[in-house]
């Protein structure tokens, strides 16, 4: 299958389109272009879909094989990856997520070091390499992988800093539905640290119930709270 970028990265079912093999190739192809652009390190974030762990491993292998260093962020909202990519010199970002698509799908979205989506020009370069024969770098030049455990904390501080000091959350009681998705940790923390009382719904990373079971029970739960 020929892989091509859509309006928001590459998306599709994980058993036919966004497969482990496809992600290995995507990692290699993007890595080759990234090296040409002078981008040396990729930050990989994801949502809570169960397939994300498989695709993360495949992408990681592809990037390392092309000589790119990898920093694994774990589950984090998509804007968090864009922000962190912009915060570090010569870093770019990849998000493993299909956003509002059903949990059977997954996708790959790429951010340039300026925090913006991959340009059309670079997408075309990647597509050309992606659908050709790919070679790995030698053992001396392969990339290295590490986990970046501060990703959530850094993004939380950034979000808090966007709130004007004259706005107070201390008198607010907020019911927050995280839909068991990528924001299940950072969103409650942001509002609590701003002073609000937070009641969470769907704050467990249960990928199969992502955006499905939460909505059914929200009215019943809210009626108990009020």
PLM regions and their residue ranges:
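Glycine-rich, flexible loop/turn motifs
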Residues: 1, 6-10, 14, 72, ...
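An N-terminal, well-structured beta->alpha segment
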Residues: 1-66, 92, 145-174
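Fold-independent oxyanion-binding glycine-rich loops
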Residues: 7-9, 47, 75, 96-99, ...
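Short, acidic Gly/Pro/Ser/Thr-rich loop/turn segments
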Residues: 12, 33, 101, 181-183
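Generic secondary-structure boundary signal with a strong preference for alpha-helix termini
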Residues: 18-24, 57, 79, 86, ...
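N-terminal small/polar loop signature for handling phosphorylated ligands or for N-terminal nucleophile
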Residues: 32, 41-105, 190-226
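Gly/Ser/Thr-enriched, mixed-charge loops and adjacent short helices
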Residues: 106-226
């Amino acid at each position: 299958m020929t892989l091509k970028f859509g309006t928001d990265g590459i998306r599709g079912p994980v058993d036919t389109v966004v497969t482990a093999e496809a992600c290995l190739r995507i990692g290699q192809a993007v890595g080759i272009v990234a090296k040409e652009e002078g981008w040396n390190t990729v930050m990989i974030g994801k949502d809570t879909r169960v397939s994300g762990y498989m695709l993360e491993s495949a992408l990681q292998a592809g990037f390392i094989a092309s000589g790119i260093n990898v920093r694994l962020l774990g589950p984090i909202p998509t804007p968090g990856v864009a922000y962190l990519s912009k915060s570090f010199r010569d870093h770019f970002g990849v998000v493993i997520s299909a956003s509002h698509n059903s949990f059977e799908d997954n996708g790959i979205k790429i951010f340039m070091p300026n925090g913006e989506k991959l340009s059309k020009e670079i997408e075309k370069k990647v597509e050309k390499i992606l659908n050709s024969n790919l070679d790995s770098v030698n053992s001396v030049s392969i990339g290295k992988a590490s986990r970046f455990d501060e990703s959530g904390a850094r993004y939380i501080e950034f979000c808090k800093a966007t709130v004007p000091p004259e706005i107070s959350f201390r008198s607010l009681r907020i019911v927050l539905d995280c839909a068991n998705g990528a924001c299940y940790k950072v969103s409650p923390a942001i509002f609590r640290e701003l002073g609000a009382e937070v009641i969470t719904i769907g704050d467990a990373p249960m990928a199969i119930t992502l955006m499905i079971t939460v909505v059914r029970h929200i009215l019943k739960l809210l009626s108990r709270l009020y």
